[in-house]
């Protein structure tokens, strides 16, 4: 990961800019550079992944124009070759192609990128700033306005505290130009339903996911894998193991006493022959990391915080004990193929609408968790299930095909990898367990018990009434909200709401986001 920031005003004060910008130096500890354009300021903290030499340092410049980008552009070599007819390149960095692309295609370039990215571009000819974000929002970007109504962009909300009154997430699939946010790609929108039959669909799911993993293995820095033992991360690791000439490095975390997933992660690691490391966390580590995790996340959402603690601690161990710089993860599968609660979807139309909602909100929940927990430890997250070609195909599939009418959730994904010896059946057909549950049921229980000890019933009721937006409804949610407000006072609207199952569906009217409370959880936690 890298950190970018742009203050789009001639009146921008460098010292104020730097005060905010330095808060995210852990995203890019290798080098830093700030450029004053005359119309504003651009800043870049570098984590070198592609093009490791100093020539790959940003901001890149072309004439009087500059760009900073936190991103990974897949297949950039082809674009670079085409552009090389007119432009000279000085590095092997994928992001160096952005300014030549902008000169050739303008803002149409953003729809041409197979990438996860957030970028801020200064057009020196027009004297204006342009910003953009990938269609899913895998790479973070936030914005706000200063007292003179000048816009400021930054990788994380903490960069903007003190500079703007209101901080908002930059909408994925949009670019900003001349005061407007313009959608260039709504990846959740289906223009034409795909009616491939089951076997054809599963064949394409297989091929597209394999391609999504394979392209994310390319890096000039060392690559590792988060392995929870669940279906999604296990598939990513299994595909990578088949594509790698040497054993891949996998990492799992759990509570020292009852981590469900550690044993399954170990089974996967043994099966695929990975170089596997287990990290154990204690109740004290869980509680002592809580404030730090909420600060780095910039959220008060219950399930995001629960699931982030284990991820934060395992990434911290990877940073401290290895020279790995890139981590592949298993996020985004649930939004495409279904959660435990989507088994209750009344019909295909309802399933599809729920999937679209979840994909459009990913940048506030699972994707946010993966970015922050990994980047704060000076690592880069790559998410194969977020491959644009893969997401577009699965979203376009006939919703009736994706409904759980097979007696097993995520059937299409499981069936797609049933052949080829990717995983043992015990993993491939294992029931889903939420990550925050599976790293140890007791972790969630520790958090709940701690929250219960912080408030009497009377205190809980009175303190909840302080909040009109996304009002806390349990002592745990109140604890998280109060910690959030100490770091981001008055910024609750950065998050659209608490992540919860669709309460309008039969069987889903619950008051906890964990799948454990659903009637169909069954053997998931065993």
Predicted regions and their residues:
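Cysteine-centered catalytic environments shared across enzyme families
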Residues: 1-299, 321, 325
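Short, amphipathic alpha-helical segments that act as regulatory/interfacial helices
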Residues: 6, 313-319, 395, 414, ...
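Hydrophobic (often cysteine-bearing) scaffold residues that line and stabilize catalytic clefts
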Residues: 13, 91-94, 113, 198-205, ...
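Short coil/turn segments at secondary-structure boundaries
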Residues: 33-36, 111-115, 166-170, 218-223, ...
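Mid-to-C-terminal catalytic subdomains of enzymes
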Residues: 92, 324-329, 333-353, 361-472
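Amphipathic alpha-helical segments that form well-ordered structural scaffolds
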Residues: 97, 208, 268, 393, ...
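Peripheral terminal appendages
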Residues: 156-158, 199-200, 208, 212-223, ...
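ATP-dependent adenylate-handling ligase core
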Residues: 257-315, 321, 338-352, 372, ...
């Amino acid at each position: 990961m890298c950190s970018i920031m742009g203050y789009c005003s001639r009146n921008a004060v460098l010292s104020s800019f730097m005060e905010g910008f330095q808060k995210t130096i852990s995203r890019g500890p290798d080098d830093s550079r700030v450029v004053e354009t005359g119309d504003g300021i651009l800043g870049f903290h570098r984590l070198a992944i592609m093009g490791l030499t100093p020539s790959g340092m940003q901001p890149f410049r072309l004439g009087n124009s500059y760009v900073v980008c936190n991103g990974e552009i897949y297949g950039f070599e082809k674009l670079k070759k085409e552009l090389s007819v007119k432009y000279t390149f000085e590095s092997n960095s994928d992001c160096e192609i952005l300014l030549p692309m902008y000169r050739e295609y303008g803002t149409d370039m953003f729809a041409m990128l197979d990438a996860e990215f957030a970028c801020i571009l200064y057009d020196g000819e027009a004297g204006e700033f342009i910003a953009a974000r990938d269609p899913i929002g895998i790479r973070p970007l936030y914005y706000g306005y200063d007292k003179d109504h000048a816009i400021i962009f930054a990788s994380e909300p903490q960069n903007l505290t003190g500079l703007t009154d209101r901080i908002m997430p930059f909408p994925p699939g949009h670019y900003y130009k001349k005061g407007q946010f313009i959608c260039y790609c709504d990846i959740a929108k289906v223009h034409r339903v795909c009616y491939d039959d089951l076997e054809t669909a599963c064949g394409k799911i297989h091929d597209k996911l394999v391609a999504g993993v394979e392209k994310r293995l390319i890096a000039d820095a060392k690559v590792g894998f988060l392995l929870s033992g669940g279906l999604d991360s296990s598939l990513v690791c299994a595909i990578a193991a088949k594509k790698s000439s040497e054993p891949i490095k996998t990492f799992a975390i759990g509570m020292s006493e009852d981590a469900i997933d550690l044993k399954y992660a170990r089974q996967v690691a043994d099966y695929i022959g990975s170089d596997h490391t287990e990290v154990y966390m204690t109740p004290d580590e869980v509680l002592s990391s809580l404030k730090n995790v909420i600060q780095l996340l910039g959220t008060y959402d219950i399930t995001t915080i629960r699931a982030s603690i284990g991820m934060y601690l395992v990434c911290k161990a990877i940073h401290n004990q290895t020279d790995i710089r890139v981590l592949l993860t298993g996020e985004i599968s649930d939004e495409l193929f279904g959660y435990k609660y989507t088994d209750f979807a009344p019909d295909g139309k309802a399933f599809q609408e729920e999937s679209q909602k979840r994909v459009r909100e990913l940048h506030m929940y699972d994707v946010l968790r993966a970015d922050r927990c990994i980047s704060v430890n000076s690592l880069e997250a790559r998410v194969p299930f977020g491959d644009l070609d893969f997401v577009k195909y699965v979203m376009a599939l006939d919703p009736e095909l994706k409904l759980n009418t097979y007696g097993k959730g995520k059937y299409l994904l499981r069936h797609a990898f049933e052949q080829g010896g990717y995983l043992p059946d015990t993993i491939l057909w294992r029931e889903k367990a939420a990550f925050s549950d599976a790293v140890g049921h007791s972790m969630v229980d520790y958090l709940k018990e701690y929250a219960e000890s912080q408030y009497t019933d009377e205190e809980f009721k009175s303190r909840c009434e302080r909040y009109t937006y996304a009002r806390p409804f349990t002592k745990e949610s109140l604890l998280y909200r109060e910690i959030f407000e100490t770091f981001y006072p008055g910024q609750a609207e950065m998050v659209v709401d608490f992540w919860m199952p669709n309460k309008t569906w039969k069987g889903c009217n619950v008051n906890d986001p964990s799948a454990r409370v659903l009637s169909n959880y069954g053997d998931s936690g065993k």
